[in-house]
Amino acid sequence: MDMQLQHPMLPRANRDEAARQDFVTALRGHMQATLMPGNQAVYEARTKHLFAAENGRLPANRREVASVMKQEPYYQFWSALQRVSQQAIWDSVTDTIDRDHDALNSAANRIAAENPAGGTLSLNPNLPVPDYVTAADIHLMPGGYAGDNAADMRQGPLYDRGLYLYLGGRCGPENDGLVYLLKGVLEKCKSGFSPKRILDMGCTIGNSTVPWKRLFPDAEVTGIDVSATALRYAHARAEALGVPVSFVQANAELTQFEDGAFDLVTSSLLLHETSAKALPRILAESRRLLAPGGVMAHFDVPQVRELDPPQAFLASWEEENNNENFAHIIREMDLPLAAQGAGWPTNVVSQPAVAMTGDVYVRNDDSPRQVCWTVLIGQA
């Protein structure tokens, strides 16, 4: 059942469009629950034995699994269908946005003018958008996060609705569930922590910004992103939801905020969409921006080091097939070591993990042999 919150900025599908979106959601749910496990069955029944016959041992890592699994017709069928279903998500949403485009822009302009919640939007037309944002359409989303027209805001509703369909609603009616998982990690790592100034890096449409204001109503909450089109939508969306937050067009690698300006510097699924050069800069900037006693908390994709080789192989599908171009590096990276290389002291950085159930594992390698989100924590 489609339970996404129908706020004023969300594109309204007609019956035909809604039927297509329902079909795509159902297809992906079927693939996740029924077809994807078939890959493991094929591996156990056939593929690992083929590898062992040639090498005298079982595959030791995901790359060795890939060398044989990619030849399996079942995997090829599943992978092709997975790719098509991802494209179908965006196709099913773009029809609605194309039809509703003028009304959405009018609503955004009206809400921004009325500014009922009292939030702010600050854009910088001279800010360069990094190549890692524009080089490929991340997640196959047409136009990527930045889009082709900064004065428009079509990438916002495309992302908002598309993300909900992509996740099958698993992150809640407002696509904000990951923040609540991260809040649980913070409670485990620093009990009683109550930040008064919060920075959400790579906020996109503000679905990871708005919940921080709800969790800490007295805090000043700021979301930054390099995409003007996403931020226009984020501001209108937050105002429509009645949540006063500030949105600023800025690059997380080097912001214009003063040293020690925030008590919490956070992100949700930002790091794996950057680059090898950008990551240490973001981690160093996070440290510079923290006040004494502040916390850095970056929530990101599951690590594969603790997974069995066939699990790690399947968990890595999006790297090659969904334009997640930096994910293959960050999934195997020692993030605390990367933070130390960016200037963080060794004794203040940790890498807990959190499952979708909310279970928190203080050390990433303490997590069970299942896919868990990873979190990089640093305490100033």
Set out the residue ranges of the language-model regions:
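Conserved SAM/SAH-binding beta-strand->alpha-helix loop
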Residues: 227-229
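Conserved SAM-binding loop of SAM-dependent methyltransferases across substrates and taxa
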Residues: 205-217
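Conserved SAM-binding strand-loop segment of SAM-dependent methyltransferases
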Residues: 242-254
